């Protein structure tokens, strides 16, 4: 017995006459009404089984029950995604609001932080996604525009909060926020009374940031002409000379440098002789005590993995910030790579020197900070040697930085 041919239109229109099925085909598991909807007795699980069975038996996927099921599933998935994204947005907003308020409370110097706030701060900072640590570092950095000199209460709140975040950064290998906090350690300070030293140690300067900056200032003055020559007359030479220490020179031109200039302008006979660690004037007004002096023991400072990662990030940011081809729209990075192919040899040499100068300046800053945190000279030299090779520094640049480490280590 031959099976009658079924017009194609019947399959598409689903007319009242269903195509004759093969004797081997099993009947549909769920009967349908004339309008294509499922019977009243069908459950949700039966709906899923029906859709799967019909699809396996080769029926058209445009079947009404399949379309309804697919639309329902798609709507549920879209609704679920929207709900998840909405929840995540709310959590992110709550985290940012908390960190903003927490940092503002630290710098206000007013009411103390209660235990609930401290516990919530610790919870946010220990999260695996690192958002709490990131936003804390951002808001602390943003406070620099107000003042770098803080009250004693604010200072010790910062010490406690930094210790929590830096410990979690070390545990999670989260080096981005730690790099920003490292910079803040040399930014915020309070004026405190100097500690009286034993008579035998009064000849030796205290290990404050001022002593480090004095030493670096002296070293910088001696080597400025050499460093200027090393910058090799690139198009950005003036800019590089101005900041060839990647921010160190800015520190040197701060209040300490201005104070030194004022001292130099005074008559010679009125200048006090520096025979003790602190002059009477310094004892009256106190000295600058920076955050790093209380955070030297943080384990993250004592691993080269942090310094290597932080240095790479700092060099990348500096190149992006100071390179005319990448300043502005981030989409110009690809255009820069395309331009490289069309550069003359002289332009390529200038570009390479520009990158070398950035590496040289950042290495000066990083080795200075490493020594200030109490890292030994060998570790600093190992770091310098590795990064000098990667950055393609020449022998004279390498010797300048090695001499800098040697001089700072003896202070």
From Swiss-Prot:
<keyword id="KW-0963">Cytoplasm</keyword>
<feature type="compositionally biased region" description="Acidic residues">
    <location>
        <begin position="46"/>
        <end position="57"/>
    </location>
</feature>
<protein>
    <recommendedName>
        <fullName>Uncharacterized protein KIAA0513</fullName>
    </recommendedName>
</protein>
<dbReference type="InterPro" id="IPR039872">
    <property type="entry name" value="KIAA0513"/>
</dbReference>
<feature type="region of interest" description="Disordered">
    <location>
        <begin position="1"/>
        <end position="91"/>
    </location>
</feature>
<feature type="region of interest" description="Disordered">
    <location>
        <begin position="253"/>
        <end position="280"/>
    </location>
</feature>
<feature type="compositionally biased region" description="Low complexity">
    <location>
        <begin position="74"/>
        <end position="86"/>
    </location>
</feature>
<dbReference type="GO" id="GO:0005737">
    <property type="term" value="C:cytoplasm"/>
</dbReference>
<feature type="compositionally biased region" description="Basic and acidic residues">
    <location>
        <begin position="258"/>
        <end position="272"/>
    </location>
</feature>
<keyword id="KW-0597">Phosphoprotein</keyword>
<feature type="modified residue" description="Phosphoserine">
    <location>
        <position position="279"/>
    </location>
</feature>
């Amino acid at each position: 017995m031959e099976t009658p041919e079924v017009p194609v239109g019947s399959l598409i229109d689903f007319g009242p006459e269903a195509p004759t099925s093969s004797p081997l085909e099993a009947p549909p598991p769920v009967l349908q009404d004339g309008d294509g909807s499922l019977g009243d007795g069908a459950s949700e699980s039966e709906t899923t089984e029906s859709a799967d069975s019909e699809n396996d038996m080769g029926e058209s996927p445009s079947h009404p029950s399949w379309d309804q099921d697919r639309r329902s599933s798609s709507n549920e998935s879209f609704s679920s995604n929207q709900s998840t994204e909405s929840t995540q947005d709310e959590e992110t907003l709550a985290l940012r609001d908390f960190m903003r308020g927490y940092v503002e409370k630290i710098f206000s110097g007013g009411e103390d932080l209660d235990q609930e706030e401290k516990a919530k701060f610790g919870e946010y900072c220990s999260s695996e996604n690192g958002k709490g640590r990131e936003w804390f570092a951002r808001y602390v950095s943003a406070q620099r525009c107000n003042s770098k000199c803080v009250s004693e209460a604010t200072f010790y709140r910062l010490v406690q909060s930094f210790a929590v975040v830096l410990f979690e950064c070390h545990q999670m290998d989260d080096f981005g926020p730690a790099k920003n906090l490292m910079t803040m350690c040399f930014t915020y300070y309070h004026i405190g009374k100097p500690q009286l030293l034993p008579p035998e140690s009064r000849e030796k300067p205290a290990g404050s940031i001022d002593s480090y900056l004095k030493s670096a200032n002296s070293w910088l003055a001696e080597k400025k002409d050499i460093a200027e020559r090393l910058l090799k007359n690139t198009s950005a030479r003036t800019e590089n000379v101005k900041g060839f220490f990647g921010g160190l020179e800015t520190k040197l031109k701060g209040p300490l440098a201005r104070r030194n200039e004022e001292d130099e302008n005074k008559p010679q006979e009125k200048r006090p002789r520096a025979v003790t660690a602190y002059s009477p004037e310094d004892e009256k007004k106190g000295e600058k005590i920076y955050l790093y002096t209380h955070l030297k023991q943080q384990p993250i400072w004592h691993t080269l993995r942090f310094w290597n990662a932080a240095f790479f990030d700092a060099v990348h940011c500096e190149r992006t910030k100071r390179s005319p081809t990448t300043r502005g729209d981030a989409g110009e990075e690809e255009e820069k790579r395309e331009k490289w192919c069309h550069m003359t040899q002289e332009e390529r040499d200038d570009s390479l020197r520009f990158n070398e100068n950035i590496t040289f300046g950042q290495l000066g800053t990083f080795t200075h900070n490493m020594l200030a945190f109490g890292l030994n000279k060998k570790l600093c030299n190992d770091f310098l040697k590795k990064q000098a090779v990667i950055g393609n520094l020449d022998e004279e640049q390498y010797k300048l930085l090695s001499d800098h480490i040697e001089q700072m280590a003896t202070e």
